[in-house]
Amino acid sequence: AMTDILSAKDIEAALTSCQAADSFNYKSFFSKVGLKGKSTDQVKKIFGILDQDKSGFIEEDELQLFLQNFSSTARALTAAETKAFMAAGDTDGDGKIGVDEFQALVKA
């Protein structure tokens, strides 16, 4: 579970900061939720949770529901947020985010 790696308090604060539509910023979210300071293995575990179909990639539909992995009551990302997040993470242009791309995104 996310709370095995991240504190419930940090998750709540990070989610509160992006409640409004189009207010999501991956850099500030990763920082607030405490992901930035985690080890490579811990970030891989989080990636595994986000990769809901276990394909080895986070696809656009999974990215849209990104916040709901942290709390079931969180909102879905807007189309604009999802596209911006994907564009930032998908460095090889294949339309999805792999584990190495996710690591780079978290540390950005």
From Swiss-Prot:
Keywords from the named record: Calcium, Metal-binding, Muscle protein, Repeat
UniProt keyword annotation of Thylakoid present: no
Domain of life: Eukaryota
Positions annotated to bind Ca(2+) 1: 51, 53, 55, 57, 59, 62
Domain EF-hand: 38-73, 77-108
Amino-acid positions noted as binding Ca(2+) 2 in the UniProt annotation, renumbered to this chain: 90, 92, 94, 96, 101
SMART domains assigned: EFh
Task performed by this protein: In muscle, parvalbumin is thought to be involved in relaxation after contraction. It binds two calcium ions.
The family this protein is said to belong to: Belongs to the parvalbumin family.
Protein name: Parvalbumin beta
